[in-house]
Amino acid sequence: MTWPDLRHATRDNLDALLALYAQLNPGDVAAPRERLAAILDRIVESDEFAVVVATLDGAVVATCYLNVIPNLTRGGAPYAIVENVVVDAAHRGTGLGQAVVRFALAQAWRRGCYKALLQTGVRDPAVHRFYESCGFSAREKTGFVARPPARIAPPGG
């Protein structure tokens, strides 16, 4: 396999990213494209966010999201969150997932992050081994998730 080009996504990558995210979360309700384009613009323009992509022959085939979060503890060192790791189904098992995650982590370390966090809802031990091969440990922290309460319809509506 030819080694991919690893870089930050651009506005021109929106459609390719949406196709990958459909593989990651097939049941997601699609948001209006204009809204998603505005979100990607915000990410692209920020120094604290990045959508990392791997491209082969110009096609986006893998991605992950990096969020560098300012912090008032740990001597002011920021920390990072890595999310939305997905490799196109035709390219899984080729090292592209590890490549985008390691690229994101390298950026986090260059930005002075003292740790990077990642959560997965997948229970498959192979997926856990994948994240461990990228440098993550499941033994250091316990993760919790809160979701907003269900929306209650207004009276008469």
Question: Which residues fall in each region the model found?
Answer:
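Conserved GNAT acetyl-CoA-binding A-motif
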Residues: 101, 108-120
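A conserved beta-turn-beta hairpin within the catalytic core of GNAT-like acetyltransferases
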Residues: 71-82, 92
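Conserved acetyl-CoA-binding loop-helix of GNAT-fold acetyltransferases
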Residues: 87, 93-106, 132-133
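Conserved beta-strand in the GNAT
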Residues: 53, 59-68, 81, 86
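A short beta-loop-alpha structural element at the N-terminal edge
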Residues: 4-17, 30
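A short helix-loop-beta-strand connector motif used in the catalytic cores of GNAT acetyltransferases and
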Residues: 41-53, 81
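Conserved GNAT-fold acetyl-CoA-binding loop/helix
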Residues: 18-41
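Conserved beta-strand-loop-alpha-helix junction that forms the acyl-donor binding cleft
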Residues: 117-127, 145, 149
